[in-house]
UniProtKB/Swiss-Prot annotation:
It comes from Acidothermus cellulolyticus (strain ATCC 43068 / DSM 8971 / 11B). GO terms for molecular function: translation elongation factor activity. This is Elongation factor Ts. Keywords: Cytoplasm, Elongation factor, Protein biosynthesis. It is found in: Cytoplasm. The keyword Transport does not apply. It holds the Pfam family EF_TS. GO terms for cellular component: cytoplasm. NCBIfam families: tsf. Associates with the EF-Tu.GDP complex and induces the exchange of GDP to GTP. It remains bound to the aminoacyl-tRNA.EF-Tu.GTP complex up to the GTP hydrolysis stage on the ribosome. Belongs to the EF-Ts family.
Length: 276
């Protein structure tokens, strides 16, 4: 019969973050051999991660960090809001975003191999997945380095960690403008920075839709060109950051606000859990 104490079970749980019953079973299977029990739990955790691979990660958090002209925005996903609101999962997010800040990549696959306190981000994700009993994965990653980078995080629920985040690179430092623009992006979700960034096929599709809709509405043939141009312009005002009405002063466009501040947006990223 295996010989071990309650203290052994507790120590194994603290080391592996596995459940009490799992720790007890592992010690029994290992005949009280502590190191073997650790190995058994790690194997079990890896198997459980494999079983969770097909599950959907519709919850999670968005984390951000900035330092000396470098900023990162990271999406860490899990299955349920129960796990998302837990301190262990949120600590994982903090560790991953710090790794992202010191790793020169915007590729999530590369970040997974980055080392944090002697362990890879991949190992941290898998260990927490095993401990929390849910599929956890690293989602999107943005990393900007420039004259000025500003981040903004927003909680969609007071009980959950931030699930909406924005990262903005400006052409020059301007804390007030950076904060205002980041909050605007969070609220209005622009898809493009300028009109020139909208792909030609997207514009062509909008023109076709506008023309077809106008015809269905019975608009006069001679009026179609003007109607189509008006609706395409409306599309730009809705989806292009610089052409949107500014959140804090709708009488101005974002471009006018940037001009007044003497800066321009170089690029931006906006992540919201559950949205592409």
């Amino acid at each position: 019969m295996a010989t071990f104490t309650t203290a052994d079970v507790k120590r194994l749980r603290e080391l592996t973050a596995a459940g009490m019953m799992d720790c007890k079973k592992a010690l029994e299977e290992a005949d009280g051999d502590f190191d073997k029990a650790v190995e058994l739990l790690r194997i079990k955790g890896a198997k459980d991660v494999g079983k969770r691979a097909e599950r959907t990660t519709a919850n999670g958090l968005v984390a951000a960090a900035t330092d000396d002209g470098v900023g990162v925005l990271v999406e860490v996903k899990c299955e349920t809001d129960f796990v998302a609101k837990g301190e262990r999962f949120q600590e994982l997010g903090r560790r991953i975003v710090q790794a992202a800040l010191t790793t020169e990549t915007d590729d999530p696959a590369v970040l997974l191999d980055a080392v944090v306190d002697g362990r890879s981000v991949r190992d941290l994700v898998e260990e927490n997945s095993a401990a929390l009993g849910e599929k956890i994965e690293l989602g999107r990653l943005a990393r900007f380095a420039g004259a000025a980078v500003v981040s903004y995080l927003h909680k969609t629920s007071p009980d959950l960690p931030p699930q909406l985040g924005v990262l903005v690179e400006l052409s020059a430092p301007n804390a007030e403008a950076g904060k205002d623009i980041a909050q605007h992006i969070a609220a209005f979700a622009p898809r493009y920075l300028t009109r020139a960034d909208v792909p030609e096929d997207v514009v062509a599709a909008e023109r076709r839709i506008a023309e077809a809709t106008a015809r269905e509405e019975g608009k006069p043939e001679q009026a179609l060109p003007k109607i189509v141009e008006g609706r395409v312009t409306g599309f730009f005002k809705e989806t292009v950051l610089t052409e949107q009405a500014f959140a804090k002063d709708p009488k101005k466009t974002v471009q006018q606000v940037l001009d007044d501040a003497g800066v321009r947006v170089v690029r931006f990223a906006r992540f919201r859990i559950g949205q592409l």
